[in-house]
Swiss-Prot record:
This is Entericidin A. The keyword Glycoprotein does not apply. PROSITE patterns: PROKAR_LIPOPROTEIN. Its main location: membrane. InterPro entries: Entericidin. Acts as antidote to the effect of entericidin B. A lipid is attached at residue 22 (N-palmitoyl cysteine). A lipid is attached at residue 22 (S-diacylglycerol cysteine). It comes from the Bacteria.
């Protein structure tokens, strides 16, 4: 039980850190879009 709770807390902290780094969920989406565009241009 304690390991599961600790795992959920760590996942929540990781997710919050990731979203904070991109400022918002919208910013995260834009970052993924730019990454996709970069990959497309590199493949061309």
């Amino acid at each position: 039980m304690m390991k599961r709770l600790l795992g959920l807390v760590m996942l929540l902290l990781f997710t919050c850190t990731l979203l904070t780094g991109c400022n918002t969920a919208r910013g995260f989406g834009e970052d993924i879009k730019h990454l996709g565009n970069s990959i497309s241009h590199a493949a061309s």
